[in-house]
């Protein structure tokens, strides 16, 4: 494979991994421990 193809595959895999981890953190089992500052304050 050419170097450019390998770089594109690496960057794409990295972005997909970061996105997957972010979605898992936001909506997965650990999300119950996250606090929402907007729900803590009454208007």
UniProtKB/Swiss-Prot annotation:
Keyword flag Heme: no
GO biological process, one term: photosynthesis
Main location: plastid
InterPro entries: PSII_PsbN
One GO cellular component, as annotated: chloroplast thylakoid membrane
Origin superkingdom: Eukaryota
Membrane topology annotation: Single-pass membrane protein
Pfam assignment, any one: PsbN
Segments crossing the lipid bilayer: 7-29
Membrane listed as a keyword: yes
Keyword terms of this UniProt record: Chloroplast, Membrane, Plastid, Thylakoid, Transmembrane, Transmembrane helix
Annotated compartments: Plastid, Chloroplast thylakoid membrane
Family recorded in the similarity comment: Belongs to the PsbN family.
UniProt xrefs under HAMAP family: PSII_PsbN
Known role: May play a role in photosystem I and II biogenesis.
Record's protein name: Protein PsbN
Species in which this protein is naturally found: Phaeodactylum tricornutum (strain CCAP 1055/1)
Gene this protein is translated from: psbN
């Amino acid at each position: 494979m050419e170097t450019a193809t390998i770089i594109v595959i690496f960057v794409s895999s990295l972005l997909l991994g970061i996105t997957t981890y972010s979605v898992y953190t936001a909506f997965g089992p650990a999300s119950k421990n996250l606090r929402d500052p907007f729900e803590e304050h009454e208007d």
